[in-house]
């Protein structure tokens, strides 16, 4: 009996017979200065294996101590997810052997998590709100990092050897596990993407992690199964591990729906396994047979005391929670006058905070959105960077917008100014000065350029006089060319129509 197939059914055919059921497990690296159970630094970019100690390497006799900031961050996340916070919880040893786990067990939580029974409301692109229920959020430590050398895929299969860096081993993690997500139907992949995006915004708003997926600070495991319409029992699930972008979460879920349906339609059986997602093809491949909880032989961690957060502390943390991201977006959407689809695009681009900061620096909302979602988003895509990593500040973007409003720059010149700032040529004002980019505001010079354009294009001028006002665009273009794009196009058009005795209406 087949358990896999290289063939896929269409997405529509898959949904014609089956309902998708998802479970999402999101791992977030907490932004503490030291590791979860020792004093080693968590700073990125250090020499391999330079941020380790006997505790995070699992040496005999080394005793762990719980990072209080890690516990506080976990409680904040639980509260923001509307979870119940445990009055008493403890750590457990998750036992398995793998080179990136030097202790041969991971310190995690099993049946007593720090937070449980919550939910997160997520908004889809058409504005519909879907509630994702949270099973639990628990604390654990990250593993080391394996780099497989010599293989074609960068994975262990076919590699000649592997390099191990234990700097990451012991970094605080919180794992957020959803309850089975049912009822999303054809929108299941979209719901998965929206959930991870919403969770990322929430984590950032709390200030407990930068949640940079491209840097591995936030990773998602996509569990998916199918069940025939009308049946209550869940199907066998697969788990696509460590998906590291919003788009990939959606693509992985969609691919697995099609793959599962193809196997089931051919009379095959889905095996419970982990799978790897491939960005280049949008497909998944088999990893290993998925273990059950009992395979890890969990037992209470004897070297750590239980965690018992006081109710007063929990309520103090609750009182300090920021505005929920969805509520904030709805408020900003009203203030900015944008629809739900556009707001979702802004969210997916990671542009909300830069736009807000640009408005606070003096730009109007429309200009701030235009530059961050236009020229700067294009630059980020071309360079493979996040918007926040571009070498330009919200204050500098606001200054460009102010120069446009003041009539000192037009959009074309403003784009050149932004290009100069991104290239390291200085502040917007310095780039304007160096490149000589100010709009031609001398009426005499503009009038002369307009006269020259009319004289050089008599046929176009006659059309305009005859009532074809749209033809003025050709003369505006001629003037802009003559002034090297440094004229105010709107003022040029006004002068052309005045010269030809034609009104705009």
Swiss-Prot record:
Catalytic activity: L-glutamyl-tRNA(Gln) + L-glutamine + ATP + H2O = L-glutaminyl-tRNA(Gln) + L-glutamate + ADP + phosphate + H(+); L-aspartyl-tRNA(Asn) + L-glutamine + ATP + H2O = L-asparaginyl-tRNA(Asn) + L-glutamate + ADP + phosphate + 2 H(+)
Family: Belongs to the GatB/GatE family. GatB subfamily.
Tree of life domain: Bacteria
Entry EC number(s): 6.3.5.-
Record key words, sorted: ATP-binding, Ligase, Nucleotide-binding, Protein biosynthesis
GO molecular-function term, one example from the UniProt record: glutaminyl-tRNA synthase (glutamine-hydrolyzing) activity
SUPFAM superfamilies (UniProt xref): GatB/YqeY motif, Glutamine synthetase/guanido kinase
PROSITE patterns xrefs: GATB
Name of encoding gene: gatB
Record text on subunit structure and interactions: Heterotrimer of A, B and C subunits.
GO-annotated biological processes: glutaminyl-tRNAGln biosynthesis via transamidation; translation
Catalytic EC class: ligase
Protein name: Aspartyl/glutamyl-tRNA(Asn/Gln) amidotransferase subunit B
One Pfam family matching this protein: GatB_Yqey
Function description: Allows the formation of correctly charged Asn-tRNA(Asn) or Gln-tRNA(Gln) through the transamidation of misacylated Asp-tRNA(Asn) or Glu-tRNA(Gln) in organisms which lack either or both of asparaginyl-tRNA or glutaminyl-tRNA synthetases. The reaction takes place in the presence of glutamine and ATP through an activated phospho-Asp-tRNA(Asn) or phospho-Glu-tRNA(Gln).
């Amino acid at each position: 009996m087949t358990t896999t197939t290289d063939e896929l059914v269409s997405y529509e055919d898959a949904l014609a017979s089956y309902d998708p059921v998802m479970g999402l497990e999101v791992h977030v690296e907490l932004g503490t200065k030291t590791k979860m159970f020792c004093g080693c630094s968590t700073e990125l970019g250090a020499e391999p294996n330079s941020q380790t100690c006997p505790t995070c390497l699992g040496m005999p006799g080394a005793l762990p101590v719980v990072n209080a900031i890690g516990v506080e961050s976990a409680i904040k996340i639980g509260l923001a997810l509307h979870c119940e916070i445990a009055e008493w919880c403890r750590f457990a040893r998750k036992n398995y052997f793998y080179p990136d786990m030097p202790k041969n067990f991971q310190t995690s939580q099993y049946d007593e998590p720090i937070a449980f029974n919550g939910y997160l409301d997520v908004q889809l692109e058409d504005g519909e709100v879907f509630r994702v229920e949270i099973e639990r959020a628990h604390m654990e430590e990250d593993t080391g990092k394996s780099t497989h050398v010599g293989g074609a895929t960068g994975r262990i299969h076919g590699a000649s050897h592997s390099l191990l860096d234990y700097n990451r081993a012991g970094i605080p993690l919180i794992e957020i596990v959803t309850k089975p997500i049912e009822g999303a139907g054809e929108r299941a992949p979209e719901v998965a993407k929206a959930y991870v995006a919403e969770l990322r915004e929430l984590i950032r708003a709390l200030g407990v992690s930068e949640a940079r997926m491209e840097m591995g600070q936030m990773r998602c495991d996509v569990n998916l199964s199918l069940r025939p319409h009308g049946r209550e029992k869940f199907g066998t699930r697969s788990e696509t591990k460590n998906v590291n972008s919003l788009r990939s979460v959606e693509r992985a879920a969609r691919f697995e729906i099609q793959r599962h349906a193809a196997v089931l339609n051919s009379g095959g059986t889905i095996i419970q396994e982990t799978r790897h997602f491939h960005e280049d093809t949008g497909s998944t491949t088999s990893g290993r047979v998925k273990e059950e909880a009992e395979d890890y032989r969990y037992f209470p961690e004897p070297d750590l005391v239980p965690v018992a957060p006081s109710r007063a502390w929990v309520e103090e943390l609750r009182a300090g929670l920021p505005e929920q991201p969805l509520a904030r977006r709805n408020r900003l959407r009203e203030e900015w006058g944008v629809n739900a689809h556009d707001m979702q695009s802004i969210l997916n681009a990671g542009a909300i905070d830069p736009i807000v900061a640009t408005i606070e620096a003096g730009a109007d909302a429309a200009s701030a959105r235009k530059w961050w979602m236009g020229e700067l988003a294009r630059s980020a895509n071309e360079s493979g960077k996040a918007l926040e990593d571009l070498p330009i500040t919200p204050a500098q973007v606001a200054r460009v917008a102010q120069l446009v409003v003041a009539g000192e720059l037009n959009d074309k010149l403003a784009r050149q100014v932004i290009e100069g700032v991104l290239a390291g040529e200085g502040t917007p004002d310095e780039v304007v000065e160096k490149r000589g980019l100010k709009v031609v505001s001398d009426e005499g010079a503009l009038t002369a350029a307009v006269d020259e354009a009319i004289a050089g294009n008599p046929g176009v001028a006659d059309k305009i006089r005859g009532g074809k006002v749209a033809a003025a665009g050709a003369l505006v273009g001629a003037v802009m060319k003559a002034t090297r794009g440094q004229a105010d196009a709107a003022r040029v058009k006004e002068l052309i129509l005045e010269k030809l005795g034609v009104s705009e209406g």
